[in-house]
Amino acid sequence: MFSPGYRYVMTTDQVDTRRVLSTALVTAVDHVGIAVPDLDVAIAWYHDHLGMIVLHEEVNEDQGIREAMLAVRGAPKGSAQVQLMAALDETSTIAKFIDKRGPGIQQLAYRVSDLDTLSERLREQGVRLLYDAPRRGTANSRINFIHPKDAGGVLVELVEPASDEH
């Protein structure tokens, strides 16, 4: 979609539709997901070198990961976070990512207000989502992913926080 030299021209109707989508349904950058081989070592590094603090830690069996959400100390509630993810076993998507690419940024996540409506609109525009239906994410959020081939090579996560989050 975003190849070099490619210029995408939108009609006024398309611009209006996309602006409404982003302002009404995408509310913030939620987090940057980083694949790490050892969660405890990564947490210590971010704390010791950048002063970040752990806001939440959990095991997500569905995704096959142990994860921690970190934030800058004193950041306002709802600020973007860093998600550190370590594989529970070699079958995990994160294990496969690290085997293929090494540790590093795995995805960029946006907070959304209505994942079902946004998913429907994206599909109507020909955007591929990885899951047919949303899955459980961190802290009981609902998530889905935009295929990297439809987002300039970036794995984009869409996160609808649980009702008591953010």
Model-predicted segments: where are they?
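A cross-kingdom feature marking solvent-exposed beta-strand/loop segments within repeated
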Residues: 18-24, 29-30, 52-55, 62-64, ...
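Short hydrophobic/aromatic beta-strand micro-patches
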Residues: 35, 71, 109-111
